[in-house]
Amino acid sequence: MHKEMDMKILTCLVTMVWIFTVAEFAEGEQKGIMEAAGWKWDEKEMEYNSKSLFDYMDGAAELYLVYGFQRLTVRKFEKPSQPPITLELYEMDSSEDAYGLFSFDRQDEAAGIGQGSEFGGGLLRFWKGKYFASIYADGEGAEVESAVLAMGRATAELIQETGPEPKLVDLIPGKDFGLVDRSARYLKSHVLLNQRFFIAHQNILNLSRRTEAVLAQYSREKQKTNLLLIRYPGVKEARDAYQSFMGAYLPDAGGKDLVKTEDQKWTMARQRGEVVIVVFGAPTAADAETLLKATEERL
């Protein structure tokens, strides 16, 4: 009887310790970064939702909303005789959205922070799980840059969960076919697509939050070619989008999927099930065919 009571008491104590430990950790995570490399939080925190985000970044909020924006938390850090540092932490709808937001402007070298990162010009950008972070200073210098990186590492450590990259990104051909480093963009909007590669003012490919697209650049012998891979919710949606694209972008194709355009380069498009593949600006018809077939083989 005593042993049974002792076991119940022990179980209760272990449970209580576990509860308090989890609660303490969760509270610490909510507090976020307090200090990094001598820069201290000014104890002011700003939060924005999908409506108030426009107050913080008028004109740029649409980019974040397209990628399933949920919440933004902003903190500033100060150190005497040094420029302030701003930490922006965006909570997105999914890890795929966080990756997409990161990929849209990616251009600098990786910093080894989170699941994907870049650092250049004093700006650190990274993603981890469903979070995207942007950390920057209002000035330059080795000490400031070191602090920005330290703050990024500390922030990434607070984000406990990781998440998958979009599976569609793995379906594009790699460096064997000339894939340009850091050129793959994960897109959810024709407006964003046009900002990276203009196709048409109208949404002729029927892109939306229900579709996903990857735009990537390939280079061979200094010739640049763009590959666009789009997955639709179903075969009908893919077929409708393909027909819309061919009618608007390649009206003179005459039933063919390969056309020489006015710039003397080749564009090729094909639908395969729920996927549409388009190759833009290939130097030769054979190059367009090779890249498109390589993509088909990975589906």
Language model regions located:
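Positively charged n-region of N-terminal signal peptides that target proteins for export
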Residues: 1-11
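Soluble, non-membrane globular domain cores that form compact, hydrophobic packing
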Residues: 11-299
